[in-house]
């Protein structure tokens, strides 16, 4: 399949983002000169706001000699000479180094090797393996059983690991802050956030948790399975979060109901207020679409469509190990254009191609990488109760934007041609032209169908009159809509 507009990176990026997220581990990239500039310097500046050279990375800087004749071992020794000999190090290979058998660790060094398989695996598949690799290399060989709750000292809180936060993950700080808030809200404590913020010396402490929360569907589950503890998927949506808290409370021997009740009157209150406000008239007809990683695509669609009843035009999930058919995504955006589109820079481009036409300008809400968008502040969650409120709030703001784009500017009204006076009757329409008009209006959100119909009808009659045509034909209407004539 020919893939346009890639929506994820190769495995080498996933390994780098996981290994650099954990403290105490030096990373050697075995690749050509400058191979770290894109993933570790440029992209992380536009996604995680990291300054250049923030991460503990050394590059072998392969040249023509190494690639064509000498191999990578000599370059590896040079890279090793600038490392701190007292700290562990891991070498990851880019696709070029993999093709020539690179990544071989020189004898007498403490560098360990991790093979990203960047030719075969994508960013999420490799991140999944990299997290497990950290545990398999620096964790415990035998996992002890946790002490039963009734045998623990009074007042000792149960513990939870949050698995998944790493670099290059959309909206991670806000979602992490919300999951931490939920865990602590029902009376538990966060044992470790892994790998981001953890130290290599503390990897063994992952077994000190009673439950693991896997933040993402794309990666992290391999480690959760290896830790031999119950694990839950981080929730998106109001009812999903309630179910998550109740199951977490059951596993931790805690009562989550007091916290849930407080949340209804605090964090969740804006949802009720928005639901009962003037925007309630639009909720049943304002459609949306989403193209994002599987975590967000599944969660946001379930929340907005199943829990709230908003009409969904399409939901496309980007899954680990599967290539997204972006050509069909582009077609969906063009033919089933929603009033609100959640997506990445790719979908924003496809949406920009549909700017001509009538009715409102669709609103775009970032929900995925790729794209240059920094979310270091913790006030934009999609997960948990705070995420449910944020999503409804942003959806309402998108509706206001749509209304803004429907209303004409006064300066535009002053610039248009005067409205020609009508004869006794309007210009007649062919039956086929009427059908094209009806089909077009039916595809518009109910919110703007009357406006769209009037705009198209007036323009078709005006241009037909200017061309000296006695009737409005289907060809004239299709021309205005940018549609091709049927074969």
Swiss-Prot record:
Q: Which gene encodes it?
A: bchZ
- UniProt lists compositionally biased (Basic and acidic residues) regions at 460-473
Subunit organization: Chlorophyllide reductase is composed of three subunits; BchX, BchY and BchZ. Forms a heterodimer of one BchY and one BchZ subunit.
> What UniProt keywords apply to this chain's record, in alphabetical order?
Bacteriochlorophyll biosynthesis, Chlorophyll biosynthesis, Oxidoreductase, Photosynthesis
Q: What does this protein do?
A: Converts chlorophylls (Chl) into bacteriochlorophylls (BChl) by reducing ring B of the tetrapyrrole.
Task: Output the InterPro entries linked to this UniProt entry.
Answer: BchZ, ChlB/BchB/BchZ, LI-POR_suB-like_C, Nase/OxRdtase_comp1, Protochlorophyllide_Rdtase
Which PANTHER family does the UniProt entry name for this protein?
A: LIGHT-INDEPENDENT PROTOCHLOROPHYLLIDE REDUCTASE SUBUNIT B
Q: Is Glycoprotein found in the keyword set?
A: no
Question: Which enzyme type, at the first EC level?
Answer: oxidoreductase
Q: What segment(s) does the record annotate as region Disordered?
A: 460-487
Q: Which reactions does this protein catalyse?
A: 3-deacetyl-3-vinylbacteriochlorophyllide a + 2 oxidized [2Fe-2S]-[ferredoxin] + ADP + phosphate = chlorophyllide a + 2 reduced [2Fe-2S]-[ferredoxin] + ATP + H2O + H(+); bacteriochlorophyllide a + 2 oxidized [2Fe-2S]-[ferredoxin] + ADP + phosphate = 3-acetyl-3-devinylchlorophyllide a + 2 reduced [2Fe-2S]-[ferredoxin] + ATP + H2O + H(+); 3-deacetyl-3-(1-hydroxyethyl)bacteriochlorophyllide a + 2 oxidized [2Fe-2S]-[ferredoxin] + ADP + phosphate = 3-devinyl-3-(1-hydroxyethyl)chlorophyllide a + 2 reduced [2Fe-2S]-[ferredoxin] + ATP + H2O + H(+)
Q: Which Pfam families match?
A: Oxidored_nitro (PF00148), PCP_red (PF08369)
One of the protein's GO biological processes: photosynthesis
Species for this entry: Rubrivivax gelatinosus (strain NBRC 100245 / IL144)
Q: Which family does it belong to?
A: Belongs to the ChlB/BchB/BchZ family.
Q: CDD domains of this UniProt entry?
A: Chlide_reductase_Z
Name it.
Chlorophyllide reductase subunit Z
Q: Which GO terms describe its molecular function?
A: oxidoreductase activity, acting on iron-sulfur proteins as donors
EC code? 1.3.7.15
